[in-house]
Amino acid sequence: MDFEQISCSLLPLLGGKENIASAAHCATRLRLVLVDDSLADQQAIGKVEGVKGCFRNAGQMQIIFGTGVVNKVYAAFTQAAGISESSKSEAADIAAKKLNPFQRIARLLSNIFVPIIPAIVASGLLMGLLGMVKTYGWVDPGNAIYIMLDMCSSAAFIILPILIGFTAAREFGGNPYLGATLGGILTHPALTNAWGVAAGFHTMNFFGFEIAMIGYQGTVFPVLLAVWFMSIVEKQLRRAIPDALDLILTPFLTVIISGFIALLIIGPAGRALGDGISFVLSTLISHAGWLAGLLFGGLYSVIVITGIHHSFHAVEAGLLGNPSIGVNFLLPIWAMANVAQGGACLAVWFKTKDAKIKAITLPSAFSAMLGITEAAIFGINLRFVKPFIAALIGGAAGGAWVVSVHVYMTAVGLTAIPGMAIVQASSLLNYIIGMVIAFGVAFTVSLVLKYKTDAE
C-alpha cells in the first residue's frame, strides 16, 4: 500500500491543503477538522485505496483506515498537506467550535468520564467476580482474600467524587488537584457514608439551618456541579489576587469558598438531581418493562450518530453509585444495540460481491461485536441504509429481552462480548441470549432486505 499516494489522492477530495485546519488520529481513524466541510467529497473519499469508511462526527471528518494502517497514513498525510502534527486534544478543541450545545455537553462529559472508566471497569469486574463467588459459595465471605478483594472492588466507587473532581477541574479550566480536594471534602470521614445512611445519620446546625451530614461516595452530579463552581471561583480569584500572593491565597480561598458552598447548597442539590434522574429511569424500566428496552435499544444507535451517547457515562455512574439502585441497567441495552450493528454488518458480507466491501465488512462486524461500532455504522450500515434499519430492529429486540429478564451490569464502559465480564453472575446466561437475539434478528433482517451492496 502506497501511503504517499493515498495522501495525495485524499487532499483534493478534502478541498485541498488550504481546507485542512488540523489533523490527528485515533486507533483506527484519521481525524480531520476542515475549514469548509462542504468542499469534501465523501463518496469519492470512500473509494480511495485503504479507506474503509468516511463520516462526519463531532465536528470532524473521520476516515477509517484500521489499526496499524492509520498511523502510516497520518504520517504521510501531514507531510503531503504541509501541516504540523496536532494532538487529539488540539484537534478536538478546534472541532468543538463546530458542535451544537448538546454535542458540546456530551463531549464535555465524555472527556470527564472516559479517563475514569478503567478504574470503574476494574472495580466492576471484581464486583462481578465476587458476586459469582458468593452466589455459588466458592469462598467464605469472612475469608481474608475475599475481604481484601471486596476492598479493591469498592475503592473506585468510594473515591469516585475525587476521581471526577480531578478530571472535571481539568476540563473546566481549574486546578485538577483542587478539584480532587473538593471531591475529598464531599467524601470526608466526618460525613456519614452514603451507603450507611439506613443505620442513621446526624445533622449539623449552621446558623439555624440543619445540614444533613451525609457523604457523597459514588455520586456524580454533586461533584460535577461543585467543581464547575470551584473553577469559576478559582479563575475569578486569580484575576483579582496579586501575583505575589496568588500561590497562597488563591487555592486557600478557592477551597474554603467552594467547600462551604458544595456542602451547604450544591451537594444537596446535585444529589437531588442525580436521585431524580435515577428515579425516573428506574421507574420507566420497572413500569414500561420490555417496551422501554425496545425503545432504548432501537434508538441507541441513532443517538450514537450524534455523539450525544458519551453523556450517558455520567448517568450510568450515578446509577451504580446510588445506594438504592447500585447496578447499571442501561448498559446491557446499549450492548444489544452494538451487537445488532455487528449482525447487520456481517449480513452485508454474505450479500455483496464487491471485493472492497467484503474486505471492510468482516473486520467492521467483528469490531462491533467487541463494542466498537463506528466502522460498522458509518462504513457499512449507514452507507447502505437498510442494514442500519435492520440493526435498529435487532437492537430493539435485544433491548426488550434484557429488560424483561432483568439483566444488570456492575460497571460502565464494556459492551457486547467484553461486557460479559461485568454482567452480574445471575444475569450472564440471559445476557448471552440477548446478544444472540440482537445479532440474529439484525443479521436476518439485513440479509432479507433488498439493497445494492457494491462500492458504487
From Swiss-Prot:
Top enzyme class: transferase
Alphabetical UniProt keywords: Cell inner membrane, Cell membrane, Kinase, Membrane, Phosphotransferase system, Plasmid, Sugar transport, Transferase, Transmembrane, Transmembrane helix, Transport
Matching SUPFAM superfamilies: Glucose permease domain IIB
Membrane topology type: Multi-pass membrane protein
TM ranges: 112-132, 144-164, 181-201, 213-233, 247-267, 288-308, 329-349, 360-380, 388-408, 428-448
MF terms in GO: kinase activity; protein-N(PI)-phosphohistidine-sucrose phosphotransferase system transporter activity; protein-phosphocysteine-trehalose phosphotransferase system transporter activity
Location in or out of the cell: Cell inner membrane
Known EC number: 2.7.1.211
Residue stretches making up the PTS EIIC type-1 domain: 107-456
Protein function: The phosphoenolpyruvate-dependent sugar phosphotransferase system (sugar PTS), a major carbohydrate active transport system, catalyzes the phosphorylation of incoming sugar substrates concomitantly with their translocation across the cell membrane. This system is involved in sucrose transport.
Name recorded for this polypeptide: PTS system sucrose-specific EIIBC component
Species in which this protein is naturally found: Salmonella typhimurium
